[in-house]
């Protein structure tokens, strides 16, 4: 059995942990969603994951 190492999403207020092999990689930082990776531009709130209401 292989274990997966999860890392915290690079969006500071985000609560999500992501698998680096499935995350969005921007400049070596791993994000759980495009909203987080884009810095919540345009006032987007939340990353779409249950229980997380990050706003960048």
Swiss-Prot record:
Zn(2+) 4 binds at residues 16, 32, 47, 49. Keywords: Cadmium, Copper, Mercury, Metal-binding, Metal-thiolate cluster, Zinc. Zn(2+) 3 binds at residues 14, 47, 52, 54. Zn(2+) 2 binds at residues 11, 36, 40, 54. Zn(2+) 1 binds at residues 9, 14, 32, 36. Belongs to the metallothionein superfamily. Type 14 family. Pfam families: Metallothio_Pro. May play a role in essential metal ion homeostasis (especially zinc homeostasis) and resistance to certain non-essential metal ions. Binds four zinc ions. Induction: Upon exposure to a range of metals, particularly cadmium, zinc, copper and mercury. One of its GO terms (molecular function) is metal ion binding. It comes from the Bacteria. The keyword Thylakoid does not apply. The keyword Phosphoprotein does not apply. This is Metallothionein.
């Amino acid at each position: 059995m292989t274990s997966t190492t999860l890392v915290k999403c690079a969006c500071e207020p985000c609560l999500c942990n992501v698998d680096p092999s499935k995350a969005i990689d921007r400049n070596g930082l791993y994000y759980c969603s495009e909203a987080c990776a884009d810095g919540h531009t345009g006032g987007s709130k939340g990353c779409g994951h249950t229980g997380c209401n990050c706003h960048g």
